[in-house]
Regions:
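Nucleotide-activated chemistry modules centered on ATP-dependent adenylation/adenylyltransferase
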Residues: 1-38, 43-209
């Protein structure tokens, strides 16, 4: 079975809308400012973007709010071709714990993470459908620690479920992750060393997300 090139899929969508002179509306689920930095710099040239901050996996409220404030700060400081808007969800960690019940001892990158992806992408699909967006996607594929194929599979499934188009991506391509590090340094963005949940924090992962 041939491996899907998600960047090429994204390129095709962009080229089609560019040829038609269209600027489609995109709901972009973001996990944090560093991961969103390159995604926004890149996608804002072609889409009318609203950032959606829904991350109930973040176990500490102060951490949740700090990452949100960094996202807002980056959006306010960075210049974009098309203005970027932001909508946030209330802090609901109970959503996460309910979704991963029974999977607490799973290793990082296992079934618990899959359920967390499903939770956040389903909420994003629902929001995109309710508010009439043309597409929705997530910044999560930029992380070297995240499985882009799995994220795209879940995103497409949720898009089909709610009747809204999933925008395929693998933001690690075109040196996206490297660019996100450069932008994080340029804007002095807070770069955490765990994804957000209490379980990943307990792992003491020294890699930055």
């Amino acid at each position: 079975m041939n491996k899907v090139n998600y960047q090429k899929e994204l390129d095709r969508v962009i080229e089609r809308h560019q040829a038609a002179g269209e600027v489609p509306r995109l709901l972009l689920h973001v996990c944090c400012a560093p991961c969103s930095s390159y995604c926004l710099e890149y996608l804002s040239n072609y889409f009318d973007i609203t950032v959606y901050y829904y991350n109930p996996n973040i176990s500490i409220k102060e951490e949740y709010e700090y990452r949100l404030s960094e996202e807002k700060r980056f959006i306010s400081l960075k210049e974009f071709k098309y203005p970027v808007k932001l909508t946030e969800s209330e802090y609901r960690p109970g959503d996460f714990f309910a979704a991963v019940k029974g999977l607490e001892k799973e290793p990082e990158g296992g079934l618990r993470c899959k359920e967390c992806f499903k939770l956040r992408l389903e909420a994003s699909a629902k929001k995109a459908k309710e508010q009439g967006f043309d597409y929705f996607t997530t910044t999560l594929t930029i992380s070297p620690l995240k499985n882009a194929a799995l994220l795209n599979e879940i995103g497409a499934e949720m898009g089909e479920k709610y009747g809204v188009s999933w925008l395929y991506s693998d933001f690690k391509k075109k040196e996206g992750y490297k660019r996100s590090i450069e932008l994080s340094r340029e804007f002095e963005l807070y770069r955490q060393n765990y994804c957000g949940c209490v379980f990943s924090r307990q792992c003491g992962d020294s890699q930055q997300y």
